[in-house]
Amino acid sequence: MQRAAAASRATAWSTARHGAARVTASASFSGGGGIVAGAALPLRVRGGQLMSLPLLSGGRAVTARVAAAEAPLPADDADAAAGRERGALAETAQLGAMIVAWYLLNIYFNIYNKQVLQPLPFPYTITAFQLAFGSFVIFLMWALKLHPAPRISISQLAKIAPLAAGHMLGTVFTNMSLSKVAVSFTHTIKASEPFFTVLLSAFFLGETPSLLVLGSLVPIVGGVALASLTELSFNWIGFWSAMASNLLYQSRNVLSKKLLGGEEEALDDINLFSILTILSFLLSLPLMLFSEGVKFSPGYLRSTGLNLQELCVRAALAGFCFHGYQKLSYLILARVSPVTHSVANCVKRVVVIVASVLFFRTPISPVNALGTGVALGGVFLYSRLKRTKPKNA
């Protein structure tokens, strides 16, 4: 029986596929041909293949060596690995290009928007124009079948409508702030968004922030306060408008979790943003007409003595950049984690502040710069600490 078992094992081992490896093994046999207790049949794996020992026989201790030259991976496996590596590099390069474009569009939006708002301080009209431009691009995208148009129910529209109202009003108050104070100061105030996120998440979603997250809000609030006290262009309307923008934008984000729940899965990120933009435009029209009337008529613009063609070109470019950077923000968020997106958004705010200071030659004191830096540092810390924040929603 022992000889039969040994012969059976040897036959099975000899039929195994030979791979590219070197295997050294020893097996001791007893005088009767049985395997001595404790002796092992070694097996190595190299290059993804099994390598077995040749048949051992003779009724005595045998030492076998099998030598084989190292062989490369099969051609199909090597090509697949190379393809995956090229694909990963291409995805990384594409993501990097999207982030750079996101930053550039944000910079140019703030520059063109400020250039339009300085001679025409009509935030409701400018907001309606920007949302109208975005809606036109969206319908063009659907008409050309660049992206499939969504199928949306009345119940979904009813749930998205409050979010659209928050989105529209947040944009109105941002434009109102930009028309009153420097671009750099508006974005310094808007760095306090995490404070409103924590407050609204606790109130509406029942999320309890950790002590570390609460601690990260201290430099944010302190930095914004320090920058506000030393801001040369300080204006109360500009300050409270930026604060109201923070409250409305973060209310939109928090309520989207509460109102939409799992139903947003029926809409992809692009179509959800598209519906949000179109509804925001429709809601902005009556507000614009009631608050400011029709300010973009050719007769009114000529009466101001402004260069009509130049003003319209800048307004159109601001609308294009506004829609472009917001859509890119959604697309980037779909590719990375929320924490990574928050950090990238923090860096984006730094880039916008620096670019606006350089372009508009905004005077800034050392204490003001310190306050801005402390606030942005707090935002970065908050973004990193969100990684450890428990998910209660």
UniProtKB/Swiss-Prot annotation:
Going by the UniProt record, its keywords in alphabetical order are:
Chloroplast, Membrane, Plastid, Pyruvate, Sugar transport, Transit peptide, Transmembrane, Transmembrane helix, Transport
- Annotated S-S bridges: none
Q: What processes does the entry annotate via GO biological process terms?
A: phosphoenolpyruvate transport; triose phosphate transmembrane transport
> Which molecular-function annotations from GO does this UniProt entry contain?
phosphoenolpyruvate:phosphate antiporter activity; triose-phosphate transmembrane transporter activity; triose-phosphate:phosphate antiporter activity
- Which segments cross the bilayer? 89-109, 124-144, 164-183, 195-217, 232-249, 270-290, 362-382
Give the family from UniProt.
Answer: Belongs to the TPT transporter family. PPT (TC 2.A.7.9) subfamily.
> Which PANTHER family does the record match to this protein?
SOLUTE CARRIER FAMILY 35
Q: What is this protein called?
A: Phosphoenolpyruvate/phosphate translocator 3, chloroplastic
Q: Which organism is it from?
A: Oryza sativa subsp. japonica (Rice)
UniProt lineage: Eukaryota, Viridiplantae, Streptophyta, Embryophyta, Tracheophyta
Q: Which gene encodes it?
A: PPT3
